[in-house]
């Protein structure tokens, strides 16, 4: 552009256009490189206009800030990986297209990390944009989610979905988000009369086509528009969500199965990302344990059809429920359709409105998975109805609750385990509250440990052999001086205080024993049972009342052949243990008492030594001697053998049952030798052989298997006097060495 100056006044050339005209002309002709026009005028009004244009090669400059930055590819193709060149996410990549290798362009194989050497190659899938899942045949037209979107936008979305059919498109996963992404969805679905209400039906995009929701809204004409809009929305979503992933629907490695974005988890491969995603899915979706707080009540997700009546929506426009009817709130509806909705269990709009906006990220992406992808265990979890009043956020709605008429039908808990369905289990029954102050009021006298030790000593001498009794006595003698030294200065009040501390400790252990599923038993230092869990009773058959001395102890199983054999064949020689031991039955109360029902009249609990076999009892007292005064908070982990609770009738029924089922003895004798484990109870062909203690072996004295007239003489063991009358012979295995009495 040129300008001439004559007589101090500027006179532009008539043929040359002005600066504005030339700028507009250059913008229309070359829009890619618009000129920069600068005009300078002096004080006399004269000036020159200069224009400069950037060269075309400027955009190719590497240091140009306007140069488009290349995104780093998730994984390079095989050709670019070998050539150590930059690749792209598209397949085939641009470099392979230029070289004519588009048919052979595929993702390269990375070197496995050390912690992935044992992982299969199928688990190490390519990146989120790899072509592992080909959706070219399963891609469907994605419906327009914005009500005011133009046709060009919808065509652009459809072209984008078709062009990226070979990749895992985020559009397909977007439909599974419970949280809405645009405020225009609310205005598109809501009827005009409900603009002031807080119901957002757009969250029905998260419902799966397999979930059929029945809305009975015909009674209210104002909600008919809502029901029609919901049906249209559900039908459009059903066509969209029906088998959205084609053949990869049941593939556990597919990321959409757990509805989370692997690319946002910053993992180098899918193996680690899927592992953490599955753990999160199990922690949030599989349990579905309803918390106690009604403000955050989630409950279990119902998978079957639910019934929504018009009463829950209100009978007028001023009585609309301010709740969301999406996946988070359908959890508390009865899946069997037997109960109506409880509005106290549903989220309010004020509490969730801050999370539903499009400016916030999609939190809890794993928990908002579609209903058909959820764990089947959530369908069987018990439903829970709370009666907690509304929170402060629903204060404006509490004045209209009298018009809603919710029907709170009591719902029974459903148990998914087949073995527990036939048992009368009371789910959710709270433990009766008991104040610890009752312990200090009830304990008035100390516990008689002296009588307990005397009873323990008498029991050990009767049951065990002298050799085993000596081993137990040595263990107790090692702690006897220390025990006497610590208790000789205690007076009556100290002993009462010690018993209160013991009962207070049992009160604390009660919750622990009930909460823990491990068989647990607590005993005093005398070995008397003080507390027992129900799992221990189930395991051994010992009732809690029997162990605590509240019922008679009729056990005959002592871990040796003395218990069951002689008591069955010779019933006249059987004497209940409670009549000739430290326990005797009170004829008035039927309870076992100490000292044959003496003056004390104290009920006698079962000793721990009665529950164990001989070797386990010796090992217990040896460990007890080490921990009694050496380490007050020590513990020993060991193994032991427990004896099941068996009465005389149980042993007789067991013996007769085995005798009837087994036929054909040796040399024509009926019945064979049987060994029952509970513990060592041995019965022979036609007679019984009894022993007491591990070192006592009794049998016939060198009976000849070939001589049927040989009879076994009576034998006695070193631990007790056991009488054995052999009417036949012991056949099959020869004879054991006999100890004559």
Curated annotation (Swiss-Prot):
Give yes or no: UniProt keyword tRNA processing.
Answer: no
Give the source's domain of life in one word: Eukaryota
User: Which segment of the chain is annotated as a signal peptide?
Assistant: none
Which intervals carry biased composition (Polar residues)? 25-61, 202-226, 291-321, 401-416, 573-586
Could you tell me what this protein does? Transcription factor which regulates nonfermentable carbon utilization. Activator of gluconeogenetic genes.
Q: What is this protein called?
A: Transcription activator of gluconeogenesis BDBG_05438
GO cellular component terms listed in the entry, alphabetical order? nucleus
């Amino acid at each position: 552009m040129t300008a001439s100056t004559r007589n101090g006044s500027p006179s532009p050339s008539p043929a040359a256009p002005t600066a504005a005209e030339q700028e507009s002309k250059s913008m229309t002709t070359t829009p890619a490189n618009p000129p920069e026009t600068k005009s300078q005028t002096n004080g006399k009004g004269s000036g020159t206009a200069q224009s400069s244009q950037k060269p075309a090669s400027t955009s190719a400059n590497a240091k140009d800030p306007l140069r488009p930055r290349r995104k780093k590819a998730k994984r390079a193709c095989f050709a670019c990986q070998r050539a150590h060149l930059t690749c792209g996410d598209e397949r085939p990549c641009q470099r392979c297209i230029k070289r004519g290798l588009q048919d052979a362009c595929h993702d390269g194989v990375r070197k496995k990390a050390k912690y992935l050497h044992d992982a299969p190659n199928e688990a190490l899938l390519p990146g989120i944009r790899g072509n592992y899942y080909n959706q070219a045949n399963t891609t469907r037209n994605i419906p327009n989610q914005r009500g005011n979107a133009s046709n060009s936008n919808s065509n652009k979305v459809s072209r984008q979905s078709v062009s990226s059919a070979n990749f895992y498109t985020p559009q397909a996963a977007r439909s599974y988000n419970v949280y809405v992404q645009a405020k225009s969805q609310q205005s598109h679905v809501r009827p005009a009369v409900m603009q002031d209400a807080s119901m957002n039906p757009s969250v029905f995009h998260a419902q799966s086509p397999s979930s059929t929701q029945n809305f009975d809204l015909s009674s209210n004409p104002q909600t008919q528009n809502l029901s029609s809009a919901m049906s249209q929305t559900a039908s459009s979503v059903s066509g969209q969500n029906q088998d959205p992933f084609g053949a990869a629907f049941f593939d556990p490695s597919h990321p959409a199965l757990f509805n989370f974005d692997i690319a946002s988890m910053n993992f180098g491969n899918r193996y680690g990302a899927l592992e953490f995603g599955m753990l999160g899915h199990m922690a949030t979706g599989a349990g579905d344990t309803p918390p106690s707080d009604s403000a955050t009540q989630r409950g279990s997700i119902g998978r079957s059809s639910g019934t929504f009546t018009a009463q829950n929506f209100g009978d007028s426009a001023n009585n609309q429920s301010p709740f969301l009817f999406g996946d988070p709130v359908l959890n508390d509806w009865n899946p069997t359709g037997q109960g109506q909705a409880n509005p106290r269990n549903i989220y309010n709009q004020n509490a969730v409105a801050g999370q539903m906006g499009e400016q916030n990220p999609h939190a809890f992406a794993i928990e908002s998975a579609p209903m058909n992808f959820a764990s089947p265990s959530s369908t069987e979890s018990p439903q829970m109805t709370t009666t907690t009043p509304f929170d402060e956020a629903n204060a404006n709605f509490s004045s209209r609750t009298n018009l809603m008429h919710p029907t709170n039908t009591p719902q029974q808990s459903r148990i998914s385990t087949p073995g527990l369905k036939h048992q009368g289990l009371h789910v959710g029954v709270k433990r009766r509250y008991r104040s610890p102050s009752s312990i200090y009021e009830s304990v008035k006298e100390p516990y008689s440990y002296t009588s307990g030790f005397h009873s323990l000593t008498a029991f050990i001498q009767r049951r065990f052999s002298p050799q085993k009794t000596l081993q137990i006595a040595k263990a107790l003698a090692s702690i006897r001086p220390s025990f006497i030294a610590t208790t000789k200065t205690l007076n009556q009040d100290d002993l009462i205080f010690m018993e209160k501390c013991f009962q207070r400790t049992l009160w604390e252990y009660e919750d622990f024993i009930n909460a823990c599923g491990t068989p647990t038993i607590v005993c005093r230092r005398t070995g008397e049972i003080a507390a027992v869990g129900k799992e221990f009773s189930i395991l051994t058959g010992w009732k809690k009342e029997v162990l605590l001395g509240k019922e008679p102890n009729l056990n005959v199983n002592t871990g040796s052949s003395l218990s069951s054999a002689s008591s069955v064949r010779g019933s006249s020689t059987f004497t209940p243990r409670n009549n000739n031991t430290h326990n005797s039955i009170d004829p008035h109360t039927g309870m076992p008492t100490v000292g044959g029902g003496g003056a004390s009249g104290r009920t006698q609990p079962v000793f721990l030594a009665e529950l164990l076999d001989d070797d386990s009892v010796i090992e217990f007292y040896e460990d007890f001697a080490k921990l009694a005064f050496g380490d007050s908070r020590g513990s020993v982990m060991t193994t032991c053998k427990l004896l099941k609770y068996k009465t005389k009738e149980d042993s007789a029924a067991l013996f007769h049952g085995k005798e009837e089922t087994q036929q054909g003895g040796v040399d024509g004798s009926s019945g064979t030798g049987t060994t029952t484990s509970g513990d060592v109870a041995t019965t022979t062909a036609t007679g019984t052989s009894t022993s007491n203690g591990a070192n006592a072996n009794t049998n016939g004295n060198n009976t000849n298997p070939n001589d049927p007239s040989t009879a076994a003489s009576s034998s006695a063991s070193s631990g007790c006097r056991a009488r054995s009358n052999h009417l036949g012979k012991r056949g099959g295995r020869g004879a054991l060495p006999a100890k004559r009495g």
